[in-house]
Amino acid sequence: MLASHFKLSSVLSPRTDEEKQYMSHVPYENAVGNLMYAMVSTRPDISHAVGVVSRFMTNPGKEHWQAVKWVLRYLRATSDRCIVFNGNSSEGSVCGYVDADYAGDLDKRRSTTGYVFTLAGGAISWMSKLKKQLHCPLLKPNI
């Protein structure tokens, strides 16, 4: 859901005292916390974006803040959208979807995987998770 032009990494974090001073007045943590609440409560569609922007909570830069504001604008523009359970739907079974961003974490080259399960057209379970470590079976030592 985060626009493809946002290539966020720790390289974009403030380096100078002036940049750090500017970002100290930005309510980044508060905004990301509000996004987390919306994600958990009613908006599973922003799970990936929230996971990405939350990686920079300790030292966010201006580009990170721009991404948070983009997600907030997305929520405002789609505030009429909601999870609907259609009782008349022919979709009486659970349906699942999965996706991954394959090394989308530009700092540590880790992937994010997510899934969503729906019933009668409405999301009933969802998750988005950053992998803890890189797994590459080709790099295992021969024993």
Where are each of the predicted segments found?
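Divalent metal-binding acidic/histidine catalytic loops
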Residues: M1-I143
